[in-house]
């Protein structure tokens, strides 16, 4: 990290632009991962791949109706192969711990193991925690007691599981990584399902260790994302001071495909015009925000591709592919 930009080991500025390749967060074996990664890099011109993973699969505990008999060894080796595919092609890999709610002790344990595994590969970036939400900024940063726990197997609803849980906070995840000796670049999502970065410019920025490659902040945005604030407060204020990584961004075809989106959230955007898709890519390009389009999987919406022949979706994938190829998009309206 140099100011609000990323530089490589030769002090050249790096602008990460790529794709989020999903399935290892819900499947111990993944869906066509070793086929999708080369296509994303070689044919879609991604210089970065985001790889969501889950700590239960990593440690071989199973989940999502699946069991593992090898203690997670085959899962970890598959991640190794994906990392190698990216490294060999000159691309970066973002290892995303795909958890929701509040950082917990098991998430720190994951990073103690995963960071040690990849600490000698500087092209691996550690995204500490997918989407924090429903906790105050002091707990987000420093940990503390929760009014209610969260079940991160419930991806959308995030239903309450245990009351009285204690979050370790995001700083503890940073410390877990650095405690292994790993100096890899770290990415940390804000509150509001990683939409709200207002706290990091108001006293809650995380602290790196001397020699660490730095911390960038993660922003997730979709047409329904607003949570009472626009782009200026949610991301641009932070972008003036810190590198930003938009690790999830996606346009949708119709509201009814996403039943969890409330009517009030639907009113904020007319998705039929495709204006949001153009404007968000324009915002990213105008501010040189790092980004990975969500999702390079045909059934994980909002989808960049419509099938396993990697046909771009008309409502999102075509624009993502154009942007990755260098086509400029005009920001007509800031939300």
Regions found by a protein language model. Name each.
Residues 1-48, 66, 322-323, 329:
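N-terminal carbohydrate-binding accessory modules
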Residues 32-54, 236-240, 244-245, 287:
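Catalytic domains of carbohydrate-active enzymes, especially glycoside hydrolases
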Residues 37-117, 122-134:
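Substrate-binding cleft and catalytic face of glycoside hydrolase catalytic domains
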């Amino acid at each position: 990290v140099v100011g609000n930009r990323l530089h490589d080991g030769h002090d050249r500025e790096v602008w990460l632009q790529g794709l989020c390749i999903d399935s290892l967060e819900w499947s111990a074996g993944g869906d066509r991962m070793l086929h999708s990664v080369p296509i994303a890099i070689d044919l879609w011109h991604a210089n970065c791949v985001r790889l969501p993973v889950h700590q239960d699969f990593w440690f071989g505990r199973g989940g999502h109706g699946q069991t593992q008999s090898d203690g997670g060894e085959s899962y970890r080796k598959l991640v190794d192969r994906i990392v190698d595919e990216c490294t060999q092609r000159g691309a970066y890999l973002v290892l995303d711990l795909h958890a929701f709610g509040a950082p917990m002790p098991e998430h720190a344990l994951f990073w103690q193991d995963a960071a040690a595994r990849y600490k000698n590969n500087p092209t691996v970036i550690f995204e500490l925690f997918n989407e924090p939400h429903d906790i105050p900024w002091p707990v987000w940063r420093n940990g503390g007691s929760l009014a209610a726990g969260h079940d991160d197997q419930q991806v959308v609803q995030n239903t309450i599981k245990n009351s009285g849980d204690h979050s370790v906070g995001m700083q503890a995840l940073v410390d877990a990584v650095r405690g292994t000796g790993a100096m890899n670049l770290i990415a940390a999502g804000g509150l509001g399902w990683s939409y709200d970065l207002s706290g990091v410019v108001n006293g809650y920025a995380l602290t790196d260790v001397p020699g660490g490659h730095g911390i960038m902040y993660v922003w997730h945005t979709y047409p329904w994302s607003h949570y009472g604030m626009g782009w200026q407060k949610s991301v641009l204020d932070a972008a003036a001071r810190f590198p930003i990584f938009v690790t999830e961004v996606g346009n949708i075809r119709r509201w009814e495909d996403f039943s969890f989106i409330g009517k009030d959230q639907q009113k904020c955007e007319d998705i039929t015009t495709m204006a949001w898709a153009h404007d968000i890519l324009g915002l990213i390009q105008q501010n040189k925000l790092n980004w990975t389009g969500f999702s390079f999987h045909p059934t994980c919406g909002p989808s960049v591709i419509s099938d396993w022949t990697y046909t771009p979706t008309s409502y999102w994938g075509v624009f993502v592919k154009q942007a990755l190829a260098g086509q400029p998009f005009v920001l007509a309206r800031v939300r």
